[in-house]
């Protein structure tokens, strides 16, 4: 499979380049040049597969030039052997709804599902290429902990984690800062997550620096994270017994990565009806999807710090789609966000968004009340 940047559709890359670079040199995000869509028969054949075997089928279609099918199979089995749940994730009923449990990995974060795989991808790559890599990652808490657990102790790779000082939970801080592995370096930044993320982006943008240190990234902009997360949309879809009604996925999201993985699954042929973007008070995605106003505001601290984000990096991939895969229009949109702090989505493009996405926003009080209500069911 060939890949392109959202800001330059004329230059192609293979998966190895996409994975190691993380971010394109032009600042854009990597996407497939063309996407293979599974047939109904193929999707039907996936129904009885274990999570691990399903992952092998889906992920190999994206990375075939990176490793053999046997190597991928071995790495997937190794990656998910550290999960407490045999099938990696678990679907439970809560009233008339189903909830997908994604917390069975080593750091209790949904990001373990992709991050454990990425850690072993790096190990495979470095063993074959005889190189050294420096991973730089921004985190609001759970990404850093999951990335550290996946990378710690591995040879020829260091991981530098930038987190906002006093803006991560106590558990997240301890998970990130109490290890003794020599290849893990934590840096607390005075600011919020967006400040950390902007520092990482600026390092990637400095081509001389990033090439000199062999810099790589594991934030949700890394395409490998997206394809790994798309697997559990397929798996959970097959577990839902009542499919007489259209199936919607409601996804808490800050950086638009996890819900974009659901969008990718839909584009691959999974019959998802709507993807509901659930936000806290930092509601830039809700405003974009419901009103067409992607306007950056001040970050509000909440009890869900992983969603305390005002610049949702993965939204650029959707902007590219909305503009009919026009890289020049995507560049202009990202320039508006960077220079004016906003991007206005016209009604035609908003209608396109709403064929796939809905959104909602909740206050702190509503979040706490909902947690209590669900817990008591």
Model-found features: residue ranges?
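PLP-dependent amino-acid enzyme catalytic core
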Residues: 1-377
């Amino acid at each position: 499979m060939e890949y392109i940047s959202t800001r330059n559709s004329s230059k192609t890359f293979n998966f190895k380049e996409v994975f190691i670079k993380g971010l394109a040199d032009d600042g854009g995000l990597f996407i497939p040049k063309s996407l293979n869509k599974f047939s109904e028969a193929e999707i039907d054949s996936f129904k009885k597969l274990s999570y691990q075997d399903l992952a092998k089928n889906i992920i190999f279609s994206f990375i075939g030039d990176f490793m053999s099918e046997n190597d991928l199979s071995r790495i997937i089995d190794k990656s998910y052997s550290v999960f407490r749940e045999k099938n990696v994730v678990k679907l439970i009923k809560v009233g008339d709804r189903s909830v997908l449990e994604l917390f069975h990995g080593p750091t209790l974060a949904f990001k373990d599902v992709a991050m454990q795989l990425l850690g072993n991808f790096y190990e495979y790559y470095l063993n074959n290429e005889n190189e050294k890599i420096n991973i730089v990652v921004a985190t609001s808490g759970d990404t850093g902990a999951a990335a550290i657990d996946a990378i710690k102790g591995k040879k020829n790779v260091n991981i530098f984690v930038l987190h906002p000082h006093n803006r991560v939970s106590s558990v997240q801080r301890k998970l990130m800062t109490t290890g003794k592995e020599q290849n893990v370096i934590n840096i607390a930044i005075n600011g919020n997550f967006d400040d950390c993320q902007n520092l990482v982006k600026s390092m990637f943008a400095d081509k001389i620096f990033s090439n000199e240190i062999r810099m790589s990234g594991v934030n949700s902009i890394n395409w490998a994270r997206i394809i790994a997360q798309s697997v559990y949309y397929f798996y959970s879809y097959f577990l839902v017994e009542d499919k007489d009604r259209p199936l919607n996925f409601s996804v808490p999201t800050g950086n638009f990565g996890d819900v974009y993985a659901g969008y990718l699954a839909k584009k691959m042929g999974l019959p998802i009806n709507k993807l509901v973007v659930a936000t806290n008070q930092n509601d830039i995605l809700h405003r974009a999807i419901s009103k067409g106003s992607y306007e950056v505001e001040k970050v509000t601290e909440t009890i869900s710090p992983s969603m305390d984000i005002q610049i949702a990096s993965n939204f650029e991939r959707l902007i590219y789609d909305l503009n009919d895969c026009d890289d020049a229009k995507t560049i202009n949109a990202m320039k508006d966000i960077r220079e004016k702090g906003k991007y206005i989505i016209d009604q035609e493009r908003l209608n396109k968004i709403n064929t796939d996405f809905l959104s909602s926003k909740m206050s702190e009080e509503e979040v706490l009340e909902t947690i209590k209500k669900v817990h008591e069911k």
